[in-house]
Amino acid sequence: MVSVKPLPDIDSNEGETDADVYEVEDILADRVNKNGINEYYIKWAGYDWYDNTWEPEQNLFGAEKVLKKWKKRKKLIAKGLLEPFDAEDNEAKKMKREKEILRQQRQKRKSELTQLSQKVKEKFKKMRKKPARRIVTIANDEEEEDDQTMDEDAFERKSMQGELKERNLTDKTSTLSTSFGETSPDVNPFYLSEWPTVTDSILLSKSLSSDAIPLKNGEIKSTMLMPSDSDNSVPGIQNSNNLENTGAFVENANSPQSNTPLSTFRHSSPLSLSPVITSDNDVANSLFFSNSTPLPSSLKIKKEAPKLETHTILVSDNSGSLTKQDILSYFAFIKGNIEVFFLKSPKKDKVCNMAYIQFDSIEQAKLAYDKGHPSWHVTLVKGKISTDMEECKVSKSILKTTPSKKANARSVSFTQTTTDTLSESEKFASNVDLDENFDFNVNVTNEDAKQLKKSVIGSSWTTVNNDWNSVSKSDQTFENDGASKVVPAGNITLNSDNSLHHSISESEDLSSASTLSDYFRFVLRVGKSLYYAGELSFDISKLKAETEHQQLLRSLVSCKQVDVLRFVTSQYLEVFGTCLTKVLSGSLCIRSDVDMTHFKNILNRGNGAGIVLGSNYTLLLFTEDNNALMNLYDCQGQSNSPFWMVIFEPLESILVEWSAKNLRPKKPYHKSQSYLSYLLQLGHIDLHKIGAFQATQILIVSKQPSPEAEELEDTFREAAIPTFRGLEIPESLFLSQNVFVFLNVSLEDDFDQLQFLTLAKRKSCKFFLFGLSLPLKSPNDSHVGTDFKKNNEPLDKLTYSQYLRPMFPKGGVVSVTLSALIKTPRLLELISPFLEIKKDSWILILPPSIVDMVKSYFVTNNPDKSLLEIQNLLNTLQRYLTNPALKNVTLYQDWDIVIDDSADVSLASTLQLYQKKNYDKYRRFVLIHELKNELTPVNGLDIVDYDEFKETFMRAIGLK
């Protein structure tokens, strides 16, 4: 059980890892990461809990036994017999521990620097009290000449020192010695008493420039040599050729004591240092020197906690290799959504190396800022960044670098301006609502289109729109400030039916960006074969270079030559190497009544994938947010377009028979037809015996935007039905009569957390579950196979279906707690008439150990209870559990039992779990309980005593 695992050492320098062979002790959890790869949460042998890591299966060499053990335990977890390991909580504790270690290290360093500062100040005070030493004249002629020169130098230095005293700056000067306070015997005392050292010059400055460049380990690099004639200038430093080894040493950031000597020098002109210290107390807390050069020309500053409260950071990379995938993978340890917004380069021939990164919370942004990056510059940015390119135009003069003629320093400033004045065409384009308007009578001009960038594609790809040299210069227009203008996608005109049409002349180069749609990036996939459900296969290697398929490319820019396969959310496209396998093996629908503009809009909103069937090609469409597909097809590069389109050989001829069976009808809606029937005809949605209905209000509830929810909403809007979609539903919308609520399958495990799923709402509303189902074990299964393992079944037996299932249809479930049985031993006999009348719609469900629970209670807590009552209760329980005629009496399964210290609480939690699994069978879930022993209310459960049950349920059907 060994595996290669690089374990980071928190106490070592950042970036260092120790790659070695480690033993896998246990697997605690598993997950599918953003790239669609299955990972396991590993407990390593000989390491503590804070060394647990997520590892892909390929890293677990020789751990087959542990994997088998984990698969067995996972089955028990799925059945509720074992509690799952909380990996997220463990990761949070790890992060908290790392922060605490870093805090202690910072505190220790701060304490050491404080002591150092105090010693320096005390030493300097003693030195200031010493009188200046006089120069003794020696008879020797050569020594007289040397002494005379030294006297002149001393006079010059005294004059400068007096000038500094007049500016009230000398009280802030200090010096450093070899042992932090002890004078080296090799150092001339004259220089120590009469001349300010390099450190003195630094301490005279008030603060370091906030524009300094961030470095690795959260430090900031600032160049000290900045000649200036400002008033606060102080004597500077000569270059290393004039160094005099005085034996003075300064503490280094990476070692206890540096071997780099510091000395004092003269310079022909004063030098100005960037402000570095905000107060006197910050002197020792912010300064230490780098050992990278003999001179202290690179000054490192300890990174203090940022005071700026923001969700956004700005990242730049001088190497120019910054990509979205690099950013997302580097900050993958941060939970939640991460939005990346790249800035356009001011120069059209260069790729911009700057990007805004926006997090869900301020704490996440600070965490990313604190971590930094070895080669990136990370800066906090005030405010949130809008990703809407039409409504927020950002000036491209983001990074201005001004070289100084007097020094080798650069001052870097970040500026962001928003263009308030838009052209009329831009204002019009930004107001177009793609959700509502399906006919676009818009005159598209050069200013309205979007610019295409070069796409960087992997070696197995050829790109259609990567030849910028073939675009005429007249088509490439840019403003002076870097704002991009549109390269038109061919000559765009309006047909007689007011639809957009791209006209292409025979002489135009079809591989150029100017002849293709500006909304997509097209790539050709070659050299691979796909297999569909074990039956359909073809060889894509026959597809040649795009220049030999001009007709194919012409058809790509037309909006009228495609049929669209139904939308599929990315969560069901785990590995799109088998993407078409999973799409085509289900009862999904080919659509021929949707235009491409509407399709692209829904695809963008839903973050899913879709397939376009043409006579000469097949297209796979997805957005950049679909990480699994982006990684699988090696899609790279930045562009204004949010879409990728992968071109395959035509599938239409292969799927003729399959398409004919699933072709979506173009039947218009008529008021004489029920809405639900119309919906079923459009989508081939399975429904269990529900009659026609006439809804006055449609509520669509989805955890996140999905193509299923988008399409369902559009269907009802086309039928002119009031429709609302979201998670938080206003209470006023439930006041209408005949309200229908559609819940997406993504919420199936969270029904008990939806506040509107109350008993009162179930009386006045009708609920339905919709969406693309998970794989079923067989087409006849009526429930989603939650314990289905994809490795246990061949692909040709998987069934994916789009369905609409009623929720909480009728009937109910009743259960009784132990306290209720103790109070009323005849409880089961009293409610038996109700169960007999409702035997077709209601059931009584009991724990499998109810008899033992009753015996144990009376023996332990109430031994004086009448033996006759106890025996009668036990006989009743035994009869209910063993009589085959009582078909509506059943027991919980062992794996459905939720264990708790209290038997009543355990039963309430078990009934809540049972409700989540049987929402499509029963409307009411009733727990008869002794109300003196209060239970926490559970959404969707009726917790009543016997009297209330009799009043509410039994009398409603004529029982007294």
UniProtKB/Swiss-Prot annotation:
For this chain's UniProt record, which GO biological process terms are given?
chromosome segregation; heterochromatin formation; pericentric heterochromatin formation; silent mating-type cassette heterochromatin formation; siRNA-mediated pericentric heterochromatin formation; subtelomeric heterochromatin formation
Sorted keywords for this record are: Cell cycle, Chromosome partition, Cytoplasm, Cytoskeleton, DNA-binding, Nucleus, RNA-mediated gene silencing
Recorded GO cellular component terms are: condensed chromosome, centromeric region; cytoplasm; heterochromatin island; mating-type region heterochromatin; nucleus; pericentric heterochromatin; RITS complex; spindle pole body
What CDD domains would the database entry show? CD_Chp1_like, RRM_SF, SPOC_Chp1p
Annotated ranges, domain Chromo: 22-74
Instruction: Give the primary localization class.
Output: nucleus
Q: Please verify whether the record's keywords include Ribonucleoprotein.
A: no
* Superkingdom: Eukaryota
- Matches recorded under Pfam families: Chp1-like_PIN (PF21484), Chp1-like_SPOC (PF22380), Chp1_domII (PF23340), Chromo (PF00385)
Could you tell me where this protein is found in the cell? Nucleus; Cytoplasm, Cytoskeleton, Microtubule organizing center, Spindle pole body
State the InterPro entries in the record.
CD_Chp1-like (IPR049937), Chp1_domII (IPR056341), Chp1_PIN (IPR048709), Chromo-like_dom_sf (IPR016197), Chromo/chromo_shadow_dom (IPR000953), Chromo_domain (IPR023780), Chromodomain_CS (IPR023779), Heterochromatin_chromo-domain (IPR051219)
The keyword Cell cycle is annotated on this UniProt entry: yes
Q: Which SMART domains match?
A: CHROMO
Give one GO molecular function term.
chromatin binding
> What's this chain's function?
Component of the kinetochore which plays a role in stabilizing microtubules and so allowing accurate chromosome segregation. Has a role in the RNA interference (RNAi) pathway which is important for heterochromatin formation and accurate chromosome segregation. A member of the RNA-induced transcriptional silencing (RITS) complex which is involved in the biosynthesis of dsRNA from primer siRNAs provided by the RNA-directed RNA polymerase (RDRC) complex.
Under the subunit heading, UniProt states: Ago1, chp1 and tas3 interact to form the core of the RNA-induced transcriptional silencing (RITS) complex. The RITS complex interacts with the RDRC complex via interaction between ago1 and hrr1. Clr4 has a role in mediating this interaction. Interacts with dri1.
What protein name is recorded for this chain? Chromo domain-containing protein 1
**In which organism is this protein found?**
Schizosaccharomyces pombe (strain 972 / ATCC 24843)
Q: Which gene encodes it?
A: chp1
